[in-house]
Amino acid sequence: MAVPKRKTSPSKRGMRRSADALKAPTYVEDKDSGELRRPHHIDLKTGMYRGRSVLTPKNSG
């Protein structure tokens, strides 16, 4: 069984754990529709991605 040769310092332990925190998702305002969407994701209401129609838009209702 592997055993650490040295004790992990509190600083190193904290640096390792710094990536574990949950972060709020970021949103950007769409240039065309003004709706909020995730960056680098398809706008599901319009079906557009980077100015191109990728999906058929969802019908509201």
Curated annotation (Swiss-Prot):
GO BP, sorted A to Z: translation
Region (Disordered): 1-61
Any one GO molecular function term: structural constituent of ribosome
Biased composition (Basic and acidic residues): 28-44
PANTHER family cross-referenced by the UniProt entry: 50S RIBOSOMAL PROTEIN L32, LARGE RIBOSOMAL SUBUNIT PROTEIN BL32
Residue ranges, compositional bias (Basic residues): 1-16
Protein name: Large ribosomal subunit protein bL32
Homology family: Belongs to the bacterial ribosomal protein bL32 family.
Pfam families in the cross-refs: Ribosomal_L32p
Matches recorded under InterPro entries: Ribosomal_bL32, Ribosomal_bL32_bact, Ribosomal_zn-bd
Keyword rRNA-binding: no
Origin species: Bartonella bacilliformis (strain ATCC 35685 / KC583 / Herrer 020/F12,63)
Superkingdom of this protein's organism: Bacteria
Keyword annotations of the record: Ribonucleoprotein, Ribosomal protein
Record's GO cellular component terms: large ribosomal subunit
